[in-house]
UniProtKB/Swiss-Prot annotation:
PTM-bearing positions, type Phosphothreonine: T372, T396
Gene source species: Macaca fascicularis
Extracellular topological segments: 1-68, 132-142, 208-230, 307-314
Residue intervals annotated with topology Cytoplasmic: 94-106, 166-185, 256-279, 339-400
Gene name as annotated: OPRM1
Motif NPxxY per record, residues: 334-338
Protein name: Mu-type opioid receptor
Keywords: Cell membrane, Cell projection, Disulfide bond, Endosome, G-protein coupled receptor, Glycoprotein, Lipoprotein, Membrane, Palmitate, Phosphoprotein, Receptor, Transducer, Transmembrane, Transmembrane helix, Ubl conjugation
InterPro entries from the UniProt entry: GPCR_Rhodpsn, GPCR_Rhodpsn_7TM, Mu_opioid_rcpt, Opioid_rcpt
Main location per the UniProt record: membrane
Lipid positions (S-palmitoyl cysteine): C353
Glycosylated sites: N9, N12, N33, N40, N48
Membrane topology: Multi-pass membrane protein
CDD domains: 7tmA_Mu_opioid_R (cd15090)
Length: 400
């Protein structure tokens, strides 16, 4: 997710389990995972502890809130990783597998699932980094993990903006929507969203590197001199372009849609189409709302930290990691939302998880028809096979 502003070494305590003194706090340019949003807050022993005097007592012993925080975050990251990977890959499979799912809206959902699947795949690396207090995976993986965080953040919010504009066109300009809202156009727009995200993702990939510090390795972003200026500039740009502007666009689109839905009884000539239109609009609105709820705390926290000095306390550290975890949690929530809010996704998920005899028959029938087209001479054999299957079903059918 947002790897843009947090220290790379999520735990700058050289080993809270074995040592009683904290290593120096990360430098302003050091970042890790979502914590990349703020260069000083990823130390579970408490940010900038050495600035307060470097006393041994400032690094909590085993069993203290820092260890509880570490265990809690590890458990949460594990759940998010498993649910996020399985759920998002299932969403992508369903959209690719079923022809009826290849709509413009679902093409955007595929893009969102791809970005979420990529970022959840980085959580095991970040968890190891957090627990060990060092980055053991090398420079290349460091660059990949940090850039994926940024790509996910920007691609996700750009895709949600696109979905909101798409819904606005479908609801408020249904005639124009016939030409604009096509799967082909949706795929082109998805590619454009990834290209736009590269404006941040690629520079971050080049800036990411590993540095040796006090016996440990940090996966960090390096800034040109003066580093404080470029670091804060990056935070402000992320806040504006990955949060403020997209939220304003989404708010305007849904404000206009709500006015339209209230003023018009029938959006189309069919009650069924009208019901589907409102249902899909509601689903997209919920997905957008959940995204904003999950990402608002970390964006606000980072921008406040960039502008004012926040006292270093255990509560601050716990709050910081909670904001990071909340941002990552969003990546596993979307598949759950689709399953509850969209009947088509719900049906396809059910068919995938619990194959029924009718689904198997339908798949076999599809394969048989395909084989018949490829080999016309086998048509008679296929007919006989179908007849035998029908007889077998009649024989094995339960008695009334």
């Amino acid at each position: 997710m947002d790897s843009s502003a947090v220290p790379t070494n999520a735990s700058n305590c050289t080993d809270a389990l074995a040592h009683s003194s904290c290593s120096p706090a990360p430098s302003p340019g050091s970042w890790v995972n979502l914590s990349h949003l703020d260069g000083n807050l990823s130390d579970p022993c408490g940010p900038n502890r050495t600035d307060l005097g470097g006393r041994d007592s400032l690094c909590p012993p085993t069993g203290s809130p820092s260890m509880i925080t570490a265990i809690t975050i590890m458990a949460l990251y594990s759940i998010v990783c498993v649910v996020g990977l399985f759920g998002n890959f299932l969403v992508m499979y369903v959209i690719v597998r079923y022809t009826k799912m290849k709509t413009a809206t679902n093409i955007y959902i595929f893009n969102l699932a791809l970005a979420d699947a990529l970022v959840t795949s980085t959580l095991p690396f970040q968890s190891v980094n957090y627990l060990m207090g060092t980055w053991p995976f090398g420079t290349i993986l460091c660059k990949i993990v940090i850039s994926i965080d940024y790509y996910n953040m920007f691609t996700s919010i750009f895709t949600l903006c696109t979905m909101s504009v798409d819904r606005y066109i479908a609801v408020c300009h249904p005639v124009k929507a016939l030409d604009f809202r096509t799967p082909r156009n949706a795929k082109i727009i998805n590619v454009c969203n990834w290209i736009l995200s590269s404006a941040i993702g690629l520079p971050v990939m080049f800036m990411a590197t590993t540095k040796y510090r006090q016996g440990s390795i940090d996966c960090t972003l390096t800034f040109s001199h003066p580093s404080w200026y470029w670091e804060n500039l990056l935070k402000i740009c992320v806040f504006i372009f990955a949060f403020i502007m997209p939220v304003l666009i989404i708010t305007v689109c849904y404000g206009l849609m709500i006015l339209r839905l209230k003023s018009v009884r029938m959006l189309s000539g069919s009650k069924e189409k009208d019901r589907n239109l409102r249902r899909i609009t509601r689903m997209v609105l919920v997905v957008v709302a959940v995204f904003i709820i999950c990402w608002t705390p970390i964006h606000i926290y980072v921008i406040i930290k960039a502008l004012v000095t926040i006292p270093e306390t255990t509560l601050q550290t716990v709050s910081w990691h909670f904001c990071i975890a909340l941002g990552y949690t969003n990546s596993c929530l979307n598949p759950v939302l689709y399953a509850f809010l969209d009947e088509n996704f719900k049906r396809c998920f059910r068919e995938f998880c619990i194959p029924t005899s009718s689904n198997i028959e339908q798949q076999n029938s599809t394969r048989i028809r395909q084989n018949t087209r490829d080999h016309p001479s086998t048509a008679n054999t296929v007919d006989r096979t179908n007849h035998q299957l029908e007889n077998l079903e009649a024989e094995t059918a339960p008695l009334p």
